[in-house]
Amino acid sequence: MNLFDFFRGRQKQTSASVAKERLQIIVAHERGQRSEPDYLPALQKELLEVIRKYVNIGNDDVHIELENQGSCSILELNITLPDR
């Protein structure tokens, strides 16, 4: 580093590093706005398979909702059972 670079401050970033930094910000922002975790669809599928062992239900008959209240997460499972 020469004396002029020291007084100019940081060197210019390359366009690749700027693009990478912007992409990281976008990904972090998208993750923060996501309301459901990654495992929720798989959990719904597995629960549906277990319930189908005992009751004949369709995919639309099971609704899973995850709600955050402070430091607690509440998993709500609603199953519409067929009439006997």
Curated annotation (Swiss-Prot):
Family stated for the protein in its record: Belongs to the MinE family.
Cell division listed as a keyword: yes
A Pfam family per the record: MinE
Keywords: Cell cycle, Cell division
NCBIfam families per the UniProt record, alphabetical: minE (TIGR01215), PRK00296.1 (NF001422), PRK13989.1 (NF010595)
Keyword Endoplasmic reticulum: no
Gene Ontology biological process: cell division; regulation of division septum assembly
Protein purpose: Prevents the cell division inhibition by proteins MinC and MinD at internal division sites while permitting inhibition at polar sites. This ensures cell division at the proper site by restricting the formation of a division septum at the midpoint of the long axis of the cell.
Highest taxon of source: Bacteria
SUPFAM superfamilies to which the protein is assigned, alphabetical: Cell division protein MinE topological specificity domain
Protein name: Cell division topological specificity factor
